[in-house]
Amino acid sequence: MMDLPLFIEHAQACAPAIEAVTLAKIAKQESALRPWALSVNYPNGTARKLGEPGGYARLQKQPSSKDQALRWAKRLIEQGHTVSFGLMQISSQNLARLGYTLEQAYEPCTNIKIAGTLLSQKLASAKTLAPDNPLPVALSLYNSGDMRMGFANGYVSGVLGQVVKPISLRVNAA
């Protein structure tokens, strides 16, 4: 698990257009700040038939290293699955469109950068749909690609309910 101060540092450096606290809330909801997190996405209610919430299924065991995460993700993709991975649970469907390889996108900074790009795109769309408060709609779009589904499945309230305590930096007096 990545500690919150390090995540905030990465978010500020890698996706400066989005508030680091917003990205931290998303990462806490998506991966519990685990950089090697991996989930399998299933279409059309398949996950629910398997007893999993939403459109994804959690793996019984999570990868313990980047190498293991890459091996598992590649194997699942080769088997025809779509996976979400990393701190921000980036969908493998976005990689080619955004010009990244799986290896690149599993790097924490790149994973956060991709999330920042995607959330910026979703915010631009959400501003036309909800000009007074676009973030909740953008979060729903980030989660599901749908402006309502992220509300219905609890994702938006889950992200907005995440607590990210302010980080105080201690400076030793010289």
What are these regions (language model features)?
Residues M1-T22, Q29, L33-R34, P53-A174:
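Non-catalytic cell-wall polysaccharide-engagement segments
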Residues K28-S31, L38-G54:
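Acidic helix-start/capping segments at beta-turn-to-alpha-helix junctions
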